[in-house]
UniProtKB/Swiss-Prot annotation:
<dbReference type="InterPro" id="IPR046346">
    <property type="entry name" value="Aminoacid_DH-like_N_sf"/>
</dbReference>
<comment type="similarity">
    <text>Belongs to the tetrahydrofolate dehydrogenase/cyclohydrolase family.</text>
</comment>
<feature type="binding site">
    <location>
        <position position="189"/>
    </location>
    <ligand>
        <name>NADP(+)</name>
    </ligand>
</feature>
<keyword id="KW-0486">Methionine biosynthesis</keyword>
<comment type="subunit">
    <text>Homodimer.</text>
</comment>
<dbReference type="Pfam" id="PF02882">
    <property type="entry name" value="THF_DHG_CYH_C"/>
</dbReference>
<keyword id="KW-0368">Histidine biosynthesis</keyword>
<dbReference type="InterPro" id="IPR000672">
    <property type="entry name" value="THF_DH/CycHdrlase"/>
</dbReference>
<protein>
    <recommendedName>
        <fullName>Bifunctional protein FolD</fullName>
        <ecNumber>1.5.1.5</ecNumber>
        <ecNumber>3.5.4.9</ecNumber>
    </recommendedName>
</protein>
<dbReference type="GO" id="GO:0006164">
    <property type="term" value="P:purine nucleotide biosynthetic process"/>
</dbReference>
<keyword id="KW-0521">NADP</keyword>
<dbReference type="GO" id="GO:0035999">
    <property type="term" value="P:tetrahydrofolate interconversion"/>
</dbReference>
<comment type="function">
    <text>Catalyzes the oxidation of 5,10-methylenetetrahydrofolate to 5,10-methenyltetrahydrofolate and then the hydrolysis of 5,10-methenyltetrahydrofolate to 10-formyltetrahydrofolate.</text>
</comment>
<dbReference type="InterPro" id="IPR020630">
    <property type="entry name" value="THF_DH/CycHdrlase_cat_dom"/>
</dbReference>
<comment type="pathway">
    <text>One-carbon metabolism; tetrahydrofolate interconversion.</text>
</comment>
<dbReference type="Pfam" id="PF00763">
    <property type="entry name" value="THF_DHG_CYH"/>
</dbReference>
<keyword id="KW-0560">Oxidoreductase</keyword>
């Protein structure tokens, strides 16, 4: 029976340490301050923005929300990013995704100053991860690494299968695991032999948004399973993994909710503080 990787618990431990860092900055007259640009009325995005704001307040961080209408033009969003980039009182900028179809989200991300890039998704910061010369990382990927580290799950020499190739989770978590000398395979929607790959994996990270994709027959005994998926099935939030059955074979497994999600939010706050310290010559 798999031991639960409790992301909420780890996030709260990290949160207490981060509060002290914020307190130290405030004693020097510096308050971490970031902005979230949310375009449109996506209900899930609005919930996520509010969740971040609550966490920011708990950490002592200022978060401003720029709520733009769904029909916002690209140039308006770009001009707002330019304004925030140039404001010395703003330490971080992020664009809430997904954006409406008329918006080129990639162009918005490219416009963010890499030194204010809370999400770690500007091209230069993504590139730095692969060059192993990074100062900011996408929050979910960094949260997964922190979770494994807390539970003393070593990556060196392990066979890892990452299911999903997004810039937000799949690619960066693969890069961070390679950096720690894991042997990483990235699978995706066109992978034909997924079960064959996962059965040989010591660690599986699934980030596809496909409910119950990973089943008991696809994993070996003692596997570590990190489920990043968030899917609604019959009014219930579930992951990519058939949790109840896979946990019988896993040595460690994350629940959904309460696994990776709280760490994603926490590491966004960690990023804001890291950027603030960097901009003020503290690291």
């Amino acid at each position: 029976m798999g031991k639960i990787l409790d992301g909420k618990f780890v996030a709260n431990l990290l949160g207490e340490k981060l509060k002290e860092k914020v307190k130290d900055l405030k004693e020097e007259g510096i308050t971490p301050h970031f902005c979230v640009i949310n375009i449109g009325d996506d209900p899930a995005s609005k919930i996520y923005v509010r969740t971040k704001k609550r966490r920011a307040e708990k950490m002592g961080i200022i978060q401003d929300i720029y709520q733009l209408p769904a029909d916002t033009k690209q140039e308006v969003a770009l001009n707002l990013i330019d304004k925030l980039n140039e404001d010395p009182d703003i330490n971080g900028v992020m664009v809430q995704l997904p954006a409406p179809e008329q918006i080129d989200a990639d162009e918005l991300l490219e416009r963010i100053d890499p030194n204010k890039d809370v999400d770690g998704l500007t091209p230069s910061n993504i590139g730095r991860i692969w060059m192993e010369n990074h100062f900011i990382e996408p929050a979910t990927a960094e949260g997964i690494i922190a979770l494994l580290k807390y539970y003393k799950i070593l990556l060196k020499g392990k066979n890892v299968v990452v299911i999903g190739r997004s810039n937000i989770v799949g690619k960066p978590v693969a890069a961070l695991m390679l950096e720690q000398n894991a042997t990483v395979t990235i699978a995706h929607s066109e992978t034909e032999n997924l079960a064959e790959l996962t059965r040989n994996a010591d660690i599986i990270v699934s980030a596809t948004g496909q409910a119950f994709l990973v089943t008991e027959d696809m994993v070996k005994d003692g596997v570590v399973v990190v489920d990043v998926g968030m899917n609604h099935v019959n009014g219930k939030l579930v992951g990519d993994v058939d949790f109840e059955n896979v946990k019988k074979k896993a040595s460690y497994i994350t629940p959904v909710p309460g696994g990776v999600g709280p760490l994603t939010v926490q590491f966004l706050m960690e990023a804001v503080v890291k950027l603030t310290r960097r901009q003020n010559g503290r690291e």
